[in-house]
Design a protein with these regions (language model features):
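Small/polar-rich, solvent-exposed N-terminal microdomains that initiate assembly or binding
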Residues: 1-57, 96-100
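The feature marks short-to-medium sequence segments in extracytoplasmic or secretory-pathway proteins
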Residues: 90, 103-106
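Generic short beta-strand segments
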Residues: 48-52, 70, 111, 131
Length: 135
């Protein structure tokens, strides 16, 4: 199910006709934002910061994951769209991590992310916090 959710996200974000429409109407594109230093166009995403619990009787060990997912544009309604998008994005997040009997992954923090075309401009984040764990 998680693999299918991730593949569905990729299909949506890479749909050429959808991207053409969004480009025409908003001047921006849907994107899976690279976690590297360069993004070549204005884009919006969701960064999922996570960690792991190595054993149930152990303290939580925080390991940072940065898995961004693209959204088409950022405006006053972006928060609502972020929340609509989160369910699928979180499923895809867990699809990347192997869940064993003694290891459980969690999402510690969720942040909308705006990346501008100007390399001098860093990303802005708006605090949207969520803790999601699988036990």
């Amino acid at each position: 199910m998680y693999k299918e959710a991730y593949e569905l996200i990729r299909e949506i974000l890479e749909d050429e006709k959808l991207n053409e429409f969004i480009q025409r109407t908003t001047g921006k594109r849907l994107a899976i934002i690279d976690s590297g230093p360069k993004v070549t166009f204005p884009a919006v995403g969701i960064m999922l910061h996570g960690g792991e619990i190595s054993r149930p009787d152990n303290n939580m060990q925080e390991v940072q994951y940065n898995i961004p997912f693209g959204l088409p544009y950022f405006d006053a309604n972006a928060m609502a769209r972020c929340h609509e998008f989160l369910d699928v994005a979180i499923e895809a997040f867990f699809a990347h991590e192997r869940l064993t009997e003694w290891r459980r992954n969690f999402v510690k923090r969720v942040e909308p992310l705006l990346v501008e075309d100007d390399p001098e401009e860093k990303c802005w984040t708006v605090a949207v916090r969520a803790t999601i764990a699988i036990f």
